[in-house]
Swiss-Prot record:
Family statement: Belongs to the universal ribosomal protein uS3 family.
Keyword tRNA processing applies: no
GO biological process, one term: translation
Gene: rpsC
Alphabetized UniProt keyword annotations: Ribonucleoprotein, Ribosomal protein, RNA-binding, rRNA-binding
InterPro entries: KH_dom (IPR004087), KH_dom-like_a/b (IPR015946), KH_dom_type_2 (IPR004044), KH_sf_prok-type (IPR009019), Ribosomal_S3_C_sf (IPR036419), Ribosomal_uS3_bac-typ (IPR005704), Ribosomal_uS3_C (IPR001351), Ribosomal_uS3_CS (IPR018280)
KH type-2 domain residues: 38-106
Subunit structure: Part of the 30S ribosomal subunit. Forms a tight complex with proteins S10 and S14.
SMART domains with a match to the protein in the record: KH
Superkingdom to which the source organism belongs: Bacteria
Protein name: Small ribosomal subunit protein uS3
GO molecular function terms listed in the Swiss-Prot or TrEMBL record: mRNA binding; rRNA binding; structural constituent of ribosome
Keyword Iron among UniProt keywords: no
CDD domains: KH-II_30S_S3
Length: 218
């Protein structure tokens, strides 16, 4: 059932790593909610900075936050002012010492989250859903994707009956665990209601980390 399951969840521990890396016993639920608040705050504050994902690591009374973004200049601000203000706000939110790392996404057209959000924004601006999907597919293939599949669901073009339409190019092997598949969803708020956007991008094969370690030892 590789077609149904979230491709990232299926590959965690094989070729993908967790986005929250910490261990807790009694206060697990509190820390989990804290993670959600941190992510929610960052995504709201940096909604125009093309943030793809936020990784959180914890050690004692310290929180390390890694922000993956296509526009690092926007996150850092003039002379680092914006990132310092963000660090202080997160320290106040968590009550812990916060350290922020910023990682630039070199090819935003190969990042499923950014592609999905781009399609959603276009749908909100009344661009044809077919055109928005086809343009995203062309850009991803030009950027070096091995395959891409996009899907939009809802009242497309203001139709009375909701439906789903998908377009794809290349291959997207969802069953192959060593296939590096990025997957993301986004929502477009249109005058007719919400339209859901899903994007799968196949970026090539990756050897599982265990195999890499074994080969290194030989």
């Amino acid at each position: 059932m590789g077609q149904k399951v979230n491709p990232i969840g299926l590959r965690i521990g094989i070729i993908r790593d967790w986005e929250s890396r910490w261990y807790a016993e009694k206060d697990y639920a509190d820390l989990l909610h804290e993670d959600l608040k941190v992510r929610e705050y960052i995504n709201k504050r940096l909604q125009d900075a093309a943030v793809s994902r936020v990784e959180i690591e914890r050690a004692a009374n310290r929180v390390n936050v890694t922000i993956h973004t296509a526009k690092p200049g926007m996150v850092i601000g003039k002379g680092g002012s914006e990132v310092e203000a963000l660090r202080k706000a997160l320290a106040q939110l968590t009550g812990k010492r916060v350290h922020i790392n910023i990682v630039e996404i070199k090819k935003p057209d190969l990042d499923a989250k950014l592609v999905a959000e781009n399609i959603a924004r276009q749908l909100e601006n009344r661009v044809s859903f077919r055109r928005a999907q086809k343009q995203a597919i062309q850009r991803a293939m030009r950027a070096g994707a091995k395959g891409i599949k996009t899907m939009v669901s809802g009242r497309l073009g203001g139709a009375d009956i909701a439906r789903s339409e998908h377009y794809s190019e290349g291959t997207v092997p969802l069953h192959t665990l060593r296939a590096d598949i990025d997957y993301a969803t986004a929502e477009a708020d249109t005058t007719y209601g919400k339209i859901g956007v899903k994007v799968w991008i196949y970026r090539g094969e990756v050897l599982p980390t265990k195999k890499k370690a074994e080969e290194g030892g030989k």
